[in-house]
Amino acid sequence: MKRERGRRPRKRVCSFCVDKVESIDYKDTHKIRKYITERGKILPRRISGNCAKHQRQVTVAIKRARHIALLPYIVE
């Protein structure tokens, strides 16, 4: 029995590293919304393609924006 080998998905490149972004601003909700699902959850690193440093910054920015009501906690 021969096993089928699927193609490995391409490694996504961190968009913040490409643009050489120093820090992610929590007030820039337009940029942050790309990293939230339609249910309001934060996208994981393996899906968003961010590096560890920028994924932490995105997470903190999303949580800050939620706290001051720029972003919703739950999208209905």
From Swiss-Prot:
A Gene Ontology BP annotation from the UniProt entry: translation
Organism for this UniProt entry: Desulfitobacterium hafniense (strain Y51)
Cellular component GO terms held in the UniProt record: cytosolic small ribosomal subunit
Stated role: Binds as a heterodimer with protein bS6 to the central domain of the 16S rRNA, where it helps stabilize the platform of the 30S subunit.
SUPFAM superfamilies: Ribosomal protein S18
Quaternary structure and interacting proteins, as annotated: Part of the 30S ribosomal subunit. Forms a tight heterodimer with protein bS6.
Family: Belongs to the bacterial ribosomal protein bS18 family.
Keywords (A to Z) from UniProt: Ribonucleoprotein, Ribosomal protein, RNA-binding, rRNA-binding
Name of protein: Small ribosomal subunit protein bS18
GO molecular function terms attached to this record: small ribosomal subunit rRNA binding; structural constituent of ribosome
